[in-house]
C-alpha cells in the first residue's frame, strides 16, 4: 500500500530523447486516463519494457509529474507538512485527513507552491533535521517504525514546486 501523488499541471523540463519510446508514452497516456489499462494491455512485452523505462526516466527528469511513497514513509512526511502548514490555513483539516487515505485529496497550485517553500525553508534552517531527531526519539519504542528523512522531504518539496498542484491517490 502506498501513496501515489500526481501533479495536476506539472512543469515539463525535458521530453524523452528516444522518439520511439516517447511515441509509446504518448500513445498509452497517463495512469489515471480511463483507457490506460486497455492501451497498456495491448502493448507487446518489448513495448511495455520501453514504456516503463521511458516513464521512469521522464518522471526523474520532471519531478512534478509523480511522487510516490509507501505508507510507512508517507505518514510522517504528510504529518510534517501539516505541522508546517496548519496554522495559517495553507491546508484544510479535510485535505490533511484525506491525504492519509488515498481518497483523492486535491491540493491547488498555490497550496503546492507554499508547501514547497515551507519545506525548503525548513530544510535550510535545520528544522527538518531537528524534527527527525525528535521524531526518532519519540517513536523509538513504537512497534511499527515509520521513517522520516530529509532526502524524502526534499524530494517532496521538489515535486510540490513543479507539480502545478497535485492529487493524492
Locate predicted features:
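Acidic (Asp/Glu-rich) sequence patches and key acidic residues
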Residues: 1-169
Amino acid at each position: 500500500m502506498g501513496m501515489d501523488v500526481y501533479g495536476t499541471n506539472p512543469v515539463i523540463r525535458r521530453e524523452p530523447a528516444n522518439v520511439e519510446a516517447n511515441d509509446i508514452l504518448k500513445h498509452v497516456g497517463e495512469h489515471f486516463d480511463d483507457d490506460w489499462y486497455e492501451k497498456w494491455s495491448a502493448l507487446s512485452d518489448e513495448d511495455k519494457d520501453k514504456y516503463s523505462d521511458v516513464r521512469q526516466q521522464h518522471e526523474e527528469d520532471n519531478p512534478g509529474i509523480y511522487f510516490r511513497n509507501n505508507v510507512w514513509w508517507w505518514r510522517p512526511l504528510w504529518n510534517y507538512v501539516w505541522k508546517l502548514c496548519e496554522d495559517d490555513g495553507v491546508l484544510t483539516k479535510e485535505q490533511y485527513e484525506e491525504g492519509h487515505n488515498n481518497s483523492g485529496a486535491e491540493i491547488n497550485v498555490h497550496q503546492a507552491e507554499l508547501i514547497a517553500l515551507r519545506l525548503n525553508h525548513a530544510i535550510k534552517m535545520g528544522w527538518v533535521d531537528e524534527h527527525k531527531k525528535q521524531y526518532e526519539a519519540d517513536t523509538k519504542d513504537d512497534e511499527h517504525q515509520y521513517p522520516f528523512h530529509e532526502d524524502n522531504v526534499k524530494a517532496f518539496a521538489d515535486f510540490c514546486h513543479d507539480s502545478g498542484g497535485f492529487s493524492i491517490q
